[in-house]
Amino acid sequence: MTKENQIVLDERVKENQHLQEEEKLALDAVYLNQITYIKAHWHVWVPTNCHILLKALDSCFLNGDPLGKSKLSVILHVKCSEDYPQRKPAVDLLDPQGLSKEDVQNLLTILRQMADTWEGCVVIAELAHRVREFLTDHTPRPAGSFHDDMLANKVRTEAEKQRKRLDTEQKELELLEEEMRQRNAIEMEKTLNGTRQENETRIIGGRRIVVLSNMPNTQLLISEWTFRFSSNRNPAEGKRKDFAPFLQKLDAVYNEIQKLCEIKGLDQNLVEYAFVHLQKISVSPDQILIQLNVAQKIFSSEENMQDTYELIVQKSNLLRLLAAQAICGLRYLHEASMTHKHLTLGSVWTRNSTGDCVFRFSDFGSMGPLLDLVKMFGDICSGKYVARDEDKEKEYDRRRKDLFQLGTLLDGLILATRGSTYSRVPTPVEGNQNTGTNLLGNFIAKCQEAKNIDQLVEDPFLKEECQSESENIFTPFGGAMSPDGRMLADNVIIRVLGRGGFGDVVLVRNKMDSTDYAIKRIPLNAKSDKLNRKIAKEAKFFAKLNHPNMVRYYYAWAEDLIPIVEETSDDDSSLGAVPIPGKEKIGKKGKLKTGKSLEDKENKANLGGGDSLMPMNLRGLVKDHSIGVDAKEWSTPFGKPEGPKCASRMRQSKRSTPSGGLKHLSECSSDDEDDDDSSEIDWDAESEEVEDEESDDSDEEDEDDGERLVQLNTETSTGADSVFERSTADEDVVFTAESEDLNAKRRESIELMEINTTTTSKSKLAIDVVPVRKPRILCIQMEYCDRATLRQYIDENHCFNAPTEVWRIFSEVLCGLKYMHDMAMIHRDIKPLNIFLTSQNGVKIGDFGLATLEAMSSKGKIVGGAAEKSTSIEAMLSPNGVKSKGSDVHQTRDIGTQLYMAPELFVDELVHKAPYTSKIDIYSAGVVLFEMFYRPLPPSMDRVSTLNNLRDDIKIPSDFGAGLAAPMAGLARRTVEKMLQRNPDERPTADDLLNDEDLPMHTKEDATFRNLCEKVIKKRDGRMNAWLLDKQFKEEVPTSLNYCYDVDICLERAKYNNREVLVETLRAEFCKILKIHSFEKLHTHTLMPVSTALAAASVRTKPVEVLDRSGVPVALPMDLRQNFVRFCVRNSVQRMKRFNFGRVYSQTSANGHPHERWECCVDCIGPQCSSPSLEAELLLVACEMMIGSLPGMKFTLKIGHAQLIEAQIRHLKLSDDVRAELLDALHLISVSDRPHSHKEKMDMLTPKIGAKAANIITKLLIPVEDNFGAFKEKVACFRKKLKVDAARVLVDKAIRDLEEIVGTFKFCRTEAIEQISIVYDSQTCYRPRTFGDGLLFQIQVEKPSTIANNKRGRRQNVLAGGRYDSALLRERHPRDFVYEIPLCISGFGVAMDVVSQIRDSINKSANIPKTPQNHCKVLICSMVQPDGSNLITQKFELAKKLWSMGIEADVFHIPVDDLESLTEHRNRASITHILAVYNTLNEVICKTETSSETMDVDSAISSVWRGVQALDGQSIHMTPCGGGPISSISTPGEAHHHDDHHPGTPVIASKCFRSSVSTTVATTSIRPISATVANLNVILVTSADRFHKVMKEKKRVESQVRNHLTEFVAHFTSKTRIEVLVCDIPADVIKKIVSELTKTSSEAEIDKLFDQLIQKHGKVDLSPLRRQFHITLNGISTGSAQVAILFYRQSDNFYRYLV
């Protein structure tokens, strides 16, 4: 023991004594008269040894135990050692009183467990206190104990709390009600003022509205129901309440609402349920507390009718909408055998009550039962409940109640409106009630009397139009829908979906199938049948379309309208109410001087008196749209956007039309208006086109100015009672009042008209009355997309930073466009507003009002070409229609929506006459794609300028794709730029985009194809499966792919061919070591199932998966042990030690040849009880292999255990998914080429397991180097922190395994292996999917650093492995035989490519040739002959002789001009001799590195033989393998691995060896007498300071040398004296000595060599060997006997023979 260790030990003893003395003082203070110390010598310090008399704690009695009532006592005996508290004390119990033997034993067990737990800490006081607690627990409780008082006080306290709670309960309820009232008032104020914060929860009628963060634009309406009851103060008073019926009904209601939450495909007029939650907090008879939450989904823009009914009731058309949508919702419920049960004002929700007018109804099926439940609960609490059998209400009665409640709701809306101008007065019976218009009152009465909902569907009140123009049944087309027409007879009109220049689109519900449809209504010209046929062309086009991504067409028909002759001015008649006396009346319409009213004149124009088809109200919208300009999408005017006024003037100057004056007046006099104002369709331009086509009609040409002025008035005015008005944004229908400016303009127009009509009264057509004609409309019934438009979807931020959703929508849009373009059709108005989304996330293209045929298509491809040559409506109505040359198709340029129009549509048709193509749709789709990827743009000039920049300069904003990954953003930008090219020919087609492999689009066709392929693939024996595989294998591989597949690996092999040679050398060296340890070589099959490969896949690499002809997926091996495991379980192998060499494969990033690596796999399988010894031998073999293959390198052996990692995972309580990610991260840390800092580990682990867990695990167990004891102590400290028993068990097992493995390994390792540093790291992890059942180890070699100032190089992992028992269980099949004895399997793998690379680097740094010249190799060739002969016979005759002598020879078949041309081949192939046949006379040129001469064949062979002898003389230096010598000239490779010999069988020396010793022994094959071990003279060469130590082991060393050289000495004669110099110098030094010196070397040569070696190997002491070598050589020179000298290395039995 060193002096420092002694000092440390003394300090530790003093510290222990100090702690014991301090503990004694504490014990004396607590147990003064009850503790007795036992000492043998009072003046000498001894460890604590005491008796403590202990009794129960005094707190178990009220006043202590003065009378000694407690009879329980025991003496605690504690005996400590000198190392206490570092070592636990001995504990015993003496003289127990009042305790049974079982209690004493239990107490003693508890105390000893405490001593084990508290090891390292003072524990006597804790033991004594635990004894007193135990006695207290076993002391019987006497009367009047403190425990009884505590219970009594607790009862009194609880009673007082109950009384106070009951006293304050009523006050709390009152305060709660007041708070609710105040909260509702505040909510109402916030709603009206618009001051609500975003994401703030609202409360309406006691119900909360919560914003859903995960569902944008959606809120939850949560109804909270709390049932609370507490019994009276005195439980004995009153009868207990029976809540069993209530609880039973509560469960029934809950189940019913739960079923409502599961309904899919709910009607759009009903509010969907989100969830229902029931929480029974307390259900005892004295205490009831139950909470029930019912959640429904509402939109953020929806408001409850309780807040907005004042705005709704003032407009009769909104009441009609409410009634119609309520009928639709109730009809859905009734057809589904459900009822609403509580249709009140609070269950009605509306969106944009002054705009969109969508009503939805909540609480269906839930509010009624819940209210009944509340009533029942109140009756039970008040004692009024009487149990009775409730008759189940009939379905018929419940439906009637719903209808009655609907009528009550409508009636209440009228009566509850303050300041209403309506009076509930019965309508007179006489006369026509429809004209007297008490329709609402009749409808309400019918609701209260109807027996089923079908009676309400046919009510006249619902057949009135839901329009904004008037409070009557008039359409915006100058007539009223006929109640007997198909529109109203078959459908219920719900609401208007949108309006434009074509007409409008209404949402209807079919009475027969209860399905919603969208019906487009287009006015027909009562004057021109030809024009009507052109208008009907849209329906014909529409009927031809049938595609999942196109809005579906159902039916089309024409319907007559009821002509309007006179209007009433009673604004309220439609509500079924009579005017209240004193109410202000609206004045009559202005009269013309002819006596006709202005309204009559307007009707005349509408019904065909004028040439324009533009309805009156739409004309007002077109001309007066500047009132509310909105920078959204609009359709361009049919003049040029750059100058509409100039273009219109030019058109006016070219022709004179009835509307020409109007256009001149309206356009030229509006210079101050915005030039960008536009509308959907230029109806005046259409009229001009019609006039051009009907120019033969002389009556139309002779219309006078009076008629024009009348049309001026009709075009600039609209109905006075309009509440709907079209905004400039074509997707908006807004509710607004007429502006004062508009009224002023109308008044001015009327005055101007009166003046002009007066001055032109004498004209022949001034005020002629045109007979009234019945107006007609075209109705097109289409599919209704119930979700939204893409415009709304983008504005609600659903597409921003959602590339998957964007590409999905875009792909479906392209599918629809491809379908249209394949049918030679162009949409011409692609924009987000015309792209519709369905509830099933489908995407459909709609609005084909501007569709046309492609001019470049042939007639045979034109859809519907047999009908007429004309195409779409607008194409024929526009004055800019261009008829392409050689085509019957007219094209209109100035159509569509300006922001989405392609640049070629803005070019003047007079300059650019080429027809446009379907590429204009591609351009528009590109703008749509840009909007989906870009942030939502508000409807302002910012949006206009951004989209205009796309068209003008293709200028994409810099923040485009800011929230996307860089590759995705770049892909989106490139796609948009391609689609927005100004040149149409440079834009891709829809088919090009769909087939672009770079775009991540998944169309429905792709999904269908994938489903079909899955079915085919799953049916392996199917006909289609075989066909599919056959097509794949027969598919021709492109030439480029054929070339590129393996070009890289071919070049790499040629570049690093020398490493392949080193791999073969390593294989030979590894075989020698493994054979010594009795490992047998076992080749297993190559391919394996993919499941096996994936189960054991590495962290970074993936297996190479291939498909065989039968369709079975297989994989190439990622390591060589996976199939070995399958071999073992199939053959029930119990014991085996095997190794194998082979290539392993992994995937490459490119589509090329898999990545290949050489691997040496060593494994052993055996019983689990033998696992420590097997694993220790694996460690030993691994170290020997690495030291032998990389001599002189610095190695580090890292040892860990998988169960230590598992214990840490359980300590952190990580889930299975997180566990896998943690193991992968630890694997990357373990195989890293350098140590990681704490920060680097945190950065790698935090994303996997969180910052807290990462901080814990990085500081938990720090690696310990070369000290297993210290590592064991750290693990013990970690074990104390564990709270999970299973984790402690894992730690204990891991430490036991490591202790036994490391002990065996250290016992068996040699001196060379001792130089390897060992690091014990509990977080060592390697390929966790494979090695995860026990020992884990890695060997790292430190590569020299290439940086000058960096002394430490990078660590390279060259070998790793461990235990993998779970692989046996994973691969075992039920048919495999299983032994009763459990098995274990362990192994490791050597990265031979890495080892060869390092070895190559070492050779280069030491200037060692790539291929050592340790054998002779001959190249035979011939010189060029004059006759051109090849001398092939002479060359092979020469080669035959050399081959018979066992000399390696190669024939060069082509004659050469100059031997110098073979220099490169000679160096690469390591050729020693070149024999060139010179002529037919058998003259041969023999060329070596030093000479070149001409000789005959025999002389050449002799020269080669001498070279062989010279090389073999140097190569006779041998090393043992299996007990016998192996010539070092053996060619590396598998042929010389001696695998065919049984381990331990000596290998006979080769022929070359026998010939090489011919200089020493006789050449005859039979030796009469051979040398034995007695000829050996063993000399121990050592330094003076180690001489005595070595001499003690001389006999053991001599015995070792004789045992290993037994067979070697047999090759010498009996007279040969063999001097064996046993030394401990490195093997490479020995090799250098025997290669440079001989027995005849001079002393100067010897000293020179040894001086060089000493200078190069300064740390190696060569002086003793030099001295002994001189002595031995002097003895040889003086003696006459034959002497052989051997240099022998004791540590690894390495030896070399000196020639």
UniProtKB/Swiss-Prot annotation:
SUPFAM superfamilies: Class II aaRS and biotin synthetases (SSF55681), Protein kinase-like (PK-like) (SSF56112), UBC-like (SSF54495). The active site is at 829 (proton acceptor). Transmembrane segments: none annotated. Residues 572-615, 632-725 are annotated as: Disordered. GO terms for molecular function: ATP binding; eukaryotic translation initiation factor 2alpha kinase activity; protein serine kinase activity. It catalyses: L-seryl-[protein] + ATP = O-phospho-L-seryl-[protein] + ADP + H(+); L-threonyl-[protein] + ATP = O-phospho-L-threonyl-[protein] + ADP + H(+). One of its GO terms (biological process) is determination of adult lifespan. Residues 669-706 have a biased composition (Acidic residues). Residues 711-720 have a biased composition (Polar residues). Keywords: ATP-binding, Kinase, Nucleotide-binding, Repeat, Serine/threonine-protein kinase, Stress response, Transferase, Translation regulation, Unfolded protein response. The keyword Membrane does not apply. GO terms for cellular component: cytoplasm; cytosol; nucleus. Residues 108-507, 508-999 form the Protein kinase domain. Disulfide bonds: none annotated. Disruption phenotype: RNAi-mediated knockdown results in slower development and shortened lifespan when exposed to mitochondrial stress. Residues 22-138 form the RWD domain. Its EC number is 2.7.11.1. CDD domains: RWD_GCN2. ATP binds at residues 114-122, 154, 497-505, 520. InterPro entries: aa-tRNA-synth_II/BPL/LPL (IPR045864), CC_SR_Kinase (IPR050339), Kinase-like_dom_sf (IPR011009), Prot_kinase_dom (IPR000719), Protein_kinase_ATP_BS (IPR017441), RWD_dom (IPR006575), Ser/Thr_kinase_AS (IPR008271), UBQ-conjugating_enzyme/RWD (IPR016135). Serine/threonine-protein kinase which phosphorylates the alpha subunit of eukaryotic translation-initiation factor 2 (eIF2alpha), leading to its inactivation and thus to a rapid reduction of translational initiation and repression of global protein synthesis. Involved in the unfolded protein response (UPR) triggered by several stresses including mitochondrial, osmotic and oxidative stresses, amino acid deprivation and UV irradiation, probably by phosphorylating and inhibiting eIF2alpha. Belongs to the protein kinase superfamily. Ser/Thr protein kinase family. GCN2 subfamily. The protein kinase domain 1 is predicted to be catalytically inactive. This is Eukaryotic translation initiation factor 2-alpha kinase gcn-2.
